[in-house]
């Protein structure tokens, strides 16, 4: 899994004219858990060490990379251990029109004619900032990804926070194409990564630490708007009763499967189960022909950690009830 998606750090700007060293705090539930320290020079070369401790687990990655004029990596090398302490050794380079990569889980090469951004299997979280800046430079703010895929970036609002020298305006961007949900990253007006935050894990420079509640509120508003649009696009409410006919229905009482069954749903409740011949739908009922496929009650998932996409994914996979373990009850 590409662990850098949710862990972004403040570092280098779009235009850097001199060598620079930067460091940022890693917080887990508001408590100090680690640091990331980066050294950047004017040639576009970065040396970054990223390390944190989460109850004995946690990444410790040292990486070096080079960028071209478009901000896209042409070389990457990383080593250390991942979150579960498994060793990491990863290399990537672009040479003679070919991109080549190798890590613990895959090895490949691909001819490239335009810009393509390599996503390491295990990278320091600053690499998310590198991707954001490259996307902002790219045509239509889109880039092909290696080994596969495409990413895009969109601005989602601004927040004014207290910085080391007074008020600073931070810009919220959301990167699409890395996972089921857009990934949020905060940049300042110079293109420097300003923060990556969540209720669990945050990476942020000390000067912005007190602004975490402001940034979280802005992120949550953007997340709610995205979830609302998704629900509007995907949800369809029947105008009347809903009848599923011609189903092979699972009966949990005796673990049998009964053919030729109908199920009547009214509103958000199953109100009747009967043989097809005994079910007389109302005139305005919506009929779904199961074509003798298997039908069963919704599943329970007894151990989840909810995010904005869990509801849609659960329903798509037949899960209608779930339990979140030790997370924010507002998400439940």
Model regions and ranges:
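Hydrophobic h-region of N-terminal signal peptides that target proteins for export
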Residues: 6-17
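Short, hydrophobic/aromatic-rich segments at coil-to-beta transitions
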Residues: 18-25, 43-49, 69-77, 97-100, ...
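N-terminal mature ectodomain segment of secretory-pathway/periplasmic proteins
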Residues: 27-103, 191
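Solvent-exposed helix/loop surface patches that form functional interfaces
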Residues: 31-33, 82-174, 197, 212-223, ...
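Gly/Pro-enriched, hydrophobic low-complexity segments
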Residues: 51, 55-58, 64-68, 169-204
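Histidine-rich, glycine-flanked metal-binding segment
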Residues: 254-296
């Amino acid at each position: 899994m590409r662990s850098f998606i949710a862990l972004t750090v403040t570092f280098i700007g779009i235009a850097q004219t001199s060598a620079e060293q930067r460091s940022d705090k890693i917080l887990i539930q508001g408590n100090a858990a680690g640091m990331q320290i980066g050294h950047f020079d004017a040639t576009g070369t970065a040396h970054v060490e990223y390390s944190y401790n989460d109850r004995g687990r946690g990444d410790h990655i040292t990486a070096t990379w080079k960028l071209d004029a478009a901000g896209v990596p042409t070389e990457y090398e990383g080593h250390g251990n991942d979150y579960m302490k498994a060793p990491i050794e990863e290399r990537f380079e672009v040479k003679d029109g070919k991109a080549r990569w190798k890590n613990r889980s895959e090895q490949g090469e691909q001819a490239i004619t335009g810009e393509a951004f390599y996503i390491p299997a295990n990278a320091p979280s600053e690499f998310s900032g590198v991707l954001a800046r490259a996307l902002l430079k790219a045509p239509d703010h889109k880039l092909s990804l290696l080994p596969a895929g495409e990413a895009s970036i969109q601005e989602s609002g601004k927040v004014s926070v207290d910085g080391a020298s007074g008020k600073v305006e931070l810009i919220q961007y959301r990167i699409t194409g890395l996972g089921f949900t857009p990934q949020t990253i905060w940049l300042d007006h110079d293109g420097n990564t300003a923060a990556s935050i969540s209720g669990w894990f945050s990476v942020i420079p000390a000067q912005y630490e007190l602004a975490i509640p402001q940034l979280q509120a802005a992120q949550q508003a953007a997340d709610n708007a995205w979830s609302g649009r998704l629900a509007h696009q995907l949800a369809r409410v029947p105008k009347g009763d809903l009848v599923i006919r011609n189903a092979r229905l699972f009966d949990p009482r005796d673990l049998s499967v009964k053919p030729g069954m109908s199920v009547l749903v009214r509103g958000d409740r199953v109100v009747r189960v009967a043989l097809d011949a005994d079910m007389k739908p109302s005139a305005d009922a919506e009929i779904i022909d199961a074509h003798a496929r298997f039908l069963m009650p919704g599943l329970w998932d007894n151990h989840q950690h909810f995010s904005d996409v869990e509801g849609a994914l659960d329903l798509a996979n037949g899960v209608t009830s779930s339990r979140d373990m030790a997370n924010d009850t507002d998400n439940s």
